[in-house]
Amino acid sequence: MCQGWALSLHRGKPQCWDSAVLADDRDISYPKGLQLQPMPEFSSRRRFLKKTAFAGGGALLGAVGLNQISPRIWHEPLVFEPNNSYWARSQPPQNPPLANDIAVDVAVLGGGFTGLSAAYYIRSISPHKRVVVLEAKGCGNGASGRNGAMVLTMTADRYMHFSSAPAIDKQIYDLTVDNIRALSKLSAATGIDCEFETNGTLQVLVTSEDVRTAKSYVQQARSLGMPVEFWEKPRLVSAIGTEVYEAGFFDPNGGHVHPMKLVHVFKVAATNAGAEIYENTTVAGIEEGRELLLHTTGGNTIKAKALVLATNAFTPRMGFFRNSILAVHEYVAVTPPFTDQQLAEIGWRQRISFNDSRTEVFYLGLRQDNRIHIGGGSPGYFFNGEAGNAADAASHFAQLQRELVRIYPRMSGVEFELGWDGVVDWSLDASPSVGYTGRNKNIFYGLGYSGHGVNLTSVFGRIIADLDAGRDERWKQYPFLNASLDYVPNEPFRWMAAQSGLAWYRLTEP
């Protein structure tokens, strides 16, 4: 994966950095649980990929068993590249690495939103426990420090459809709204300004079919007590200054944040709660048991009664959930700051982040320093999780610039100041899951965020803390607890499925 491009799309050539590679070829089963409601077949890229995988490879799977042996042929590399995103300019100072063998109650693997929030909540609930966070690079190096900065509620799914249990959908919405308020309070308590603004989020609608679906969706959502609004085109244009969309629906409870500054909030909160954080500490091996044994590349061992997997897209490469998660490359770029006069000419009057209704979604945000960032579009998947390349990255950033100019023609000629990419974890049906795995049920996890991670990660951090404390009753009603995720085939069928699905959507997206 190449990231951190200093961009001029008209001049200059981006550079890519080398990274160390580790591998772990174990595979571990996990318990079955409640299944999230699937999204409609016509609208889900993930379902298309899954069906392509079975159609293209199913006969061969049974005939030659390649799907079973391919993990031993193609090891997925565990690549930790430096985070050179715009957000990374605000990365908090790093802690020293682990320098000796230790024994702990809970070891948290990964220093992003999931890991740091889990450490904070575990210590808050169980202050007698020794909790350590082990981060391979610096906190926020992964998806937590590279994302699109939108803080989203869970309003059913982003294709504007409720499940067969809309009352549960409303409870999930309320849970994510409450968490946004908790994040705001936590930021205030630490004294760190993470640029948290809860002035709502917009989904802008691309087609007339999207408009019809959204009107029905908003009507049902409001009947359940969700305060979402349908915005006709004039109101939409007044807010964000573009006429390219048909309409939109607005959620007043969403918002945006500076992701790396939010990482800093969680790092300080976890530290203040008594958690220990070790950075530049890579775990290369995990031995299961009633007491787990973790091995670092520095030669140290960690004995732990419980483990939290907070490794997002890298989770399969640690030997867990190999057939549940795709590590997908997402691309983001940011402009130089605009003056107030320039923003007035562009017409973006309200500082509301928005994303469109396409499957290969684009999303945009207006920062406090008047920069505009745009991300999304065609994601990337490379064979066996390998790194991307300069030509591929440049083509994605060019796509982002074309889309930015399409939305705001006045931005023609504006060059991105910086572009970056990073891998995020996607499940095939965009369903998240939180729970426990392993033979001794002492390995906790949260994954499959599929674009909702800025908010949902710390919801799952709270749930993990409750599970560790044996307090799972309040979460049993939620479909994401121990949810079994749709099957992802091994290579080469994974790559075949991903390329077929992505190519199909590039041809059919409006």
Where are the language model's segments positioned?
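Helical element adjacent to the flavin cofactor pocket in flavoenzyme catalytic cores
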Residues: G248-E291, T296-G298
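Active-site substrate-recognition segment that forms the wall
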Residues: A189-E197, V283, T301-I302, A306-Q341, ...
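Glycine-rich FAD pyrophosphate-binding loop
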Residues: I125-R146
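Glycine-rich active-site loop/strand segments that organize a redox cofactor
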Residues: R146-D174
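C-terminal catalytic lobe of FAD-dependent flavoproteins
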Residues: F382-A390, R402-Q499
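N-terminal Rossmann-like FAD-binding beta1-loop-alpha1 element of flavoenzymes
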Residues: V106-V132
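Extreme N-terminal leader/targeting segments of oxidoreductases
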Residues: L34-V106, S124-I125
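Rossmann-like flavin
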Residues: A165-A269
